[in-house]
C-alpha cells in the first residue's frame, strides 16, 4: 500500500521540488523507494498474489498502477545546499501538509565565522571578510545562548518568502544580474527554543561553529548564523545545514533517494 506520508533524507545539490520530481519518476517506473509498495499493488492487479512470479500480466499491471501517479508535496523547503529530513505527502497525505509545516524543527548547522555572503550560505559571493583573532569556544557558546527566545531578524534575500506575490530569491537573482544587491528584506519573528554548541574549531583565518538548533516554524538558520556573527562582532555565513527533526519525526527513520 502506498504510504500517505514519506520521510526522505534529502541529499545535497537538489532542490526540494527536485526531490518530488525524483519520487514521481520512481513511482512512474515502479522502482526505488516505491518498489515494495508497487509490488503488492501489481500482484493484486495481475492476480499473481503471493507467487513472486513476474509474468507479462504482472509487468502490464505494474505499468497500469504506475501510470496513476498520485499528487505529492512537501512540508517545508530545504535549500539546495542543505540536507536532511523532508516530510513528503502523497495522495490524501498532501492534505496534512498545511499542519505539518507548522511543526517545530531541529537542525545541525555549521556556521563559518569571518565572512558574509550575498545568499547567507556558500552559494553566494563574499561581500564582507574579517580575520578571526582570539575567538574562543566559550565566547561563541555565550553568544549562542543570547539567541534563545524570540528574535526579530531579517530573512535572507534569497529566501522563498513572497513580497507582493514574488519570491524573494527571484528578486535577488534579477538584481544580481544587474550587478545590484537586494538590501530591503522582510523582518520576521523567529523562535529559538534550544541551542547547543557541538564543536568549535579554527580553519585558517576563519572559525567554524557546529551548532544544534531547536526552533519554531518559520525560523531561518541563515538568519541565525548571520546574527551570531553580529553578536560576536564578525561577519558570518551558513556553511552546511542538516535538518534532523520535524516535530516527532526523526531523520533516523527517513529513506534515501537511492537513485539520485
Q: How does the language model describe each region?
A:
Residues 1-260:
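Catalytic/RNA-binding core of pseudouridine synthases
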